[in-house]
Curated annotation (Swiss-Prot):
GO BP: leucyl-tRNA aminoacylation
Motif 'HIGH' region boundaries: 41-51
This protein's record includes keyword Ligase: yes
Name of the protein this chain belongs to: Leucine--tRNA ligase
Keyword field contains Ribonucleoprotein: no
Organism the protein comes from: Methanococcoides burtonii (strain DSM 6242 / NBRC 107633 / OCM 468 / ACE-M)
Catalyzed reactions: tRNA(Leu) + L-leucine + ATP = L-leucyl-tRNA(Leu) + AMP + diphosphate
Enzyme class: ligase
Family of the protein in this entry: Belongs to the class-I aminoacyl-tRNA synthetase family.
Length: 962
């Protein structure tokens, strides 16, 4: 081994050896297979530190399973379809300043190179090379023979086959449907196309048509039932409004809306024609007619109304909406004569229409008073609004003044009333985003009711039933996300599956459309298996539907597939055999942002196309990664590219840092201070290993083990057990805690106690435990301890728990010694005393019996202080200690129930003569404390000048220092 740790030299050395030995190129054989995939990255930028989390978790699992004896396939491809790469090419062509800055400063692309990346093809070529280089540089154990990009002609043949199959099953339908739409690109947009508002959903509002002078004043609401309680409408006098002619389903009307609403209405399935601009002030102070009950309500000025929300005109229900009440209250003392309003607004009659047990007549007023809300700008107004809406929705019923709807639950009324309003011609559905959405081209998006659009029929109940069954039978990690997956299936509606612009595959049954970028990314895991054979010389025109039918579905005979494709039957049979061996996917590991889209579609398409035995077996989810507290963005920054992370810190250091930062759904934050700590840990690991190897410590004879050696072997089994259990449930942070941090603490204690005979054996186990996490350094140490040629640690056996090496007596002894030494050190630190003598008092017999009995009861699951005390007090010897017994028993119960699982497991069979154990290690205490040490049992304390023996506790001797 080199004298000093040099990450670059070590990592390049082992990456070259892995590549030369083809160790990660998986072929079907007679071993149990493990097929793991992660979402292929989208190539509109370099991979960044955020990718390290999902990708490294996947690699850890792949390496672990490989060392466990599984035949592991871990492939990778590249996602490039859709509009983002086309948009990026246009921005580069136009020398967009922000884009040029982000891609030179954050992505590290030289200016001249970037200027040359002015077509989608050049962008794909550049980033695919960079992405593979970065993944190789961090040590991912990927089978690169299977790589592809989603614009490869061969892959397009596969996607055409998939979509023809879905079309034949009536799972792709044509119709009108609201979609997220970019007016500039004239295309639907998906999550990959969006600059801001990726989480936005399309919400269906009810548009209520108030009437005035032959015109319609429409108001959009999520709570149509509150139309019964409208006292006024809100209009912003500073907004631009327009009069438009709206034709819908043969009905022609004149509407007045904000100019922003007019722009949105153009994209609905209505015919919209501009008539004239309208002065907003002319709309204030008029009386409009409530279409549901013909009540006359006044329009009032409100600066809070935004033109982009709904129609730009808002109905006001102050009895049930805190903001409406506050806004109205703010107008009570204002002079509104400029709008022709002279009446006292205090005279407006509030209308109560919902009965809810937590409130009286006017919930909004009560909530405002309850929270002490001062005005509309008070943050507590939002809190008051949420509590009113939540209680009314979950427990409210409509009152008698709502007519035939009286007694209906608020939670059930929306669809019923909206349908009735539409039938009466006084309402319509209006689609709006839950938050603003901006396309990557910079254009604000709209909800477009697209006619003649192709949709995946995700609302199909029979299709959903299959997905529910798949979710029920697969592993979801962490388990509590199973409910979220089911909920997402519940809510999923039909989704546009085609677009007119971008990169991608033409819809095979309608070549005017391109398949959108999430639709072509659902069953590509099966293509990895075929891709290896395609790379060996199969031509694009040979990828006929019959080939996929035979290989993936067994729908077509081998003879027909061979005849139609022109591929040798033996090759087809090999592809088919490989598919049967590798499929289904054993684990799909992904970030949590993909749950509502990619992962959901992954399940839908698998259950639609494949037989049940080919459905995915498990999904594991992890959280996000931020950079110094800020969200990373490839297109906006900030950004730490994966290549920069490796160059600056090293592959193993980067891997160790990101894996130790957070567990499963927790979000991680990449901090420079944190990765410097990881660097020190790796260097410490290297130096420790180098010292052990260089020391020439002989192999220990297991027949001559000392107590501390037995303890080391016992603790090692616990670390092995905990690491394996954590990796089996994809808790990589917990696994690393055990495999490195806790085990290193054990080793240091072992050395402190004079142990060294087992250091070589421990090192052998330790580097194998660590190999999935930090593979390069572990290969280097593995070689240094005598493994040469192709004897790689990547293929070594992963350590397994050996119960025969567990020694509870040794663990009790070290628990006692370690705890006692720590307590003495703490007393010295607090008192600042330099002791000449330390006296230790071990627990009296009655306390020891109480402790053992409590442990036994806890082990059986029936530890109860009352029962414990009653049982103890049957013993005359116990009764002789009087009130001390109940008091001590209560403390013991409290301590045991607070123990973590590992400590309780260690103590559950507790049996130790503490005095003998301490006496056997008397010299150790003398050396550590630098003074004389005496040991007594509290039952027979010959010297106890300050009555300290009474504080003795099992495994916690009482201490007196002189």
């Amino acid at each position: 081994m080199q004298q000093d740790y040099n990450s670059s030299n070590i990592e390049q050395k082992w990456q070259q050896k892995w590549n030369e030995s083809k160790v990660f190129e998986a072929e079907a054989d007679d071993r149990d297979k493990y097929f793991i995939t992660i979402p292929y990255p989208y190539l509109n930028g370099n991979l960044h530190a955020g990718h390290t989390r999902t990708f490294t978790i996947g690699d850890v699992v792949a390496r672990y399973k490989r060392m466990m004896g599984n035949n592991v396939l871990y492939p990778m491809g590249f996602h490039v379809t859709g509009t983002p790469i086309v948009g990026l090419a246009e921005l580069i062509q136009n020398r967009d300043p922000e884009t040029m800055k982000v891609y030179t400063e954050f992505h590290g692309i030289p200016v001249e190179t970037l200027k040359g990346m002015d077509t989608p093809e050049k962008i794909v070529d550049y980033f695919s090379v960079e992405a593979e280089r970065s993944m190789r540089s961090i040590g991912y154990s990927i089978d690169w023979r299977r790589k592809f990009t989603t614009t490869d002609p061969n892959y397009k043949k596969f996607i055409e086959w998939q979509f023809n199959l879905l079309y034949e099953k009536d799972l792709i339908v044509k119709g009108s449907h609201p979609v997220k739409w970019c007016p500039n690109d004239d295309n639907p947009v998906e999550d990959h196309d969006i600059l801001h508002g990726e989480e936005a959903t399309i919400i269906d509002y009810t548009l209520v048509k108030f009437k005035y002078d032959g015109m319609i004043i429409p108001c959009a609401t999520l709570r149509p039932e509150t139309v019964f309680g409208v006292t006024n409408l809100w209009i912003n006098p500073d907004l631009e409004h327009v009069k438009i002619k709206v034709t819908f389903e043969g009905r022609e009307e004149v509407w007045v809306v904000s100019k922003e609403a007019y722009r949105k209405l153009i994209f609905t399935d209505r015919e919209v024609e501009f008539i004239e601009d309208v002065d907003a002030s002319s709309l204030i102070g008029i009386k409009v007619t409530n279409p549901l009950n013909d009540a006359q309500v006044i329009t009032l000025p409100a600066s809070f109304v935004k033109g982009e929300n709904g129609s730009g005109i808002v109905m006001s229900v102050p009895s049930h909406a805190p903001y409406d009440y506050l806004a109205l209250r703010d107008l009570y003392d204002k002079d509104l004569r400029e709008y022709g309003i002279t009446e006292d607004l205090r005279e407006l009659k509030f209308i109560s229409l919902i009965k809810v047990k937590e409130f009286g007549e006017f919930p909004a007023i009560e909530a405002v008073e309850q929270f002490g809300v001062k005005d509309q700008d008070d943050p507590k107004a939002e809190e008051a609004t949420k509590i009113v809406y939540r209680r009314e929705f979950h427990g409210g019923v409509l009152k008698e003044n709502t007519g035939k709807y009286s007694g209906m639950a608020v939670s059930k009324i929306k669809d019923v009333l909206t349908r009735d309003l539409i039938e009466m011609g006084i309402g319509e559905v209006f689609y709006e985003f839950s938050e603003p959405v901006v396309c990557r081209c910079g254009t604000p998006c709209v909800v477009n009711m697209v006619k003649g659009q192709w949709f995946l029929n995700y609302s199909n109940p029979e299709w959903k039933d299959k997905v529910y069954r798949c979710i029920e039978n697969m592993d979801i990690i962490p388990e509590d996300l199973r409910v979220e997956f089911n909920n997402k299936v519940d809510w999923l509606k039909d989704k546009a599956c085609a677009r007119k612009k971008g990169l991608g595959t033409l819809l095979p049954f309608d070549n005017q459309w391109l398949i959108e970028s999430l639709g072509d990314s659902t069953i590509y895991m099966s293509y990895y298996i075929i891709a290896k054979f395609i790379a060996m010389g199969i031509e694009t025109e040979q990828l006929v539907p019959e080939l996929f039918d035979h290989v993936l579905l067994k729908k077509c005979s081998l003879e027909t597939a061979a005849e139609r494709s022109g591929i040798d039957a033996n090759i087809i049979e090999q592809i088919s055999s490989d598919f049967e061996y590798w499929y289904p996917v054993d684990l799909r590991s992904s970030g949590k942002d993909l749950i509502p889209n990619h992962l959901l579609f992954f399940l839908f398409h698998h259950v639609a196309i494949f037989d049940e035995d080919k459905w995915p077996r498990a999904i594991a989810i992890n959280g996000f990664v931020s950079l110094e507290g800020k969200k990373m963005s490839k297109s906006k920054g900030p950004l730490l590219t994966l290549n920069d992370a490796i160059t600056n810190y090293g592959a193993d250091i980067s891997r160790m840092y990101i894996l130790s930062s957070a567990e499963q759904m927790q979000d991680a934050d990449w901090k420079n201070s944190g990765i410097e700590t990881a660097r020190k840990q790796i260097e410490r690991f290297y130096n420790f290993s180098k010292d052990i190897i260089g020391s020439g410590i002989p192999t220990c004879n297991v027949e001559n083990l000392k107590g501390i050696d037995k303890w080391m072997l016992s603790r090692l089994q616990q670390r092995i057990l905990e690491t394996n259990e954590a990796l089996d449930t994809i808790r990589t942070r917990n696994a690393l805690q055990n495999a490195y941090f806790l085990l290193f603490n054990d080793i240091r204690w072992y050395q402190k106690r004079g142990g060294n005979a087992l250091l070589c054996e421990v090192l052998d186990v330790w580097i194998r435990l660590m190999a999935p996490f930090t593979p390069h350094i572990c290969e280097e140490i593995w070689e240094a301890i005598g493994h040469t040629d192709n004897d790689l640690i990547s293929l070594a056996d992963y350590p397994q728990y050996d119960e025969s090496l567990v020694d509870t007596q040794a663990e009790f002894t070290e628990e006692l010694i370690g705890g006692t030494l720590s307590d003495v050190d703490e007393i010295i630190r607090v008192t600042k005393l330099t002791p000449k003598k330390a006296i230790l008092y071990t627990s009296p017999e009655w306390k020891m019996e109480t402790f053992k009995k409590a442990l036994s009861m806890q082990k059986e699951g029936n530890l109860n202080p009352g029962i414990l005390i009653k049982d103890l007090m049957r013993d005359p010897e116990m009764r002789s200690h009087g009130k001390e017994v109940p008091k001590f028993a209560q403390k013991v119960v409290s301590d045991i129930t607070a123990m973590n699982e590992e400590k309780f497991d260690t103590l559950s069979n507790f049996d130790l003569d503490e005095k003998i154990a301490l006496e056997e290690n008397l010299e150790f205490f003398k050396n550590e404390l630098g003074c004389s040490v005496e040991i007594y049992s509290a039952d027979n304390a010959e010297y106890d000048p300050e009555n300290k023996a009474r504080f003795a506790y099992p495994l916690r001797p009482a201490i007196y220092l002189e």
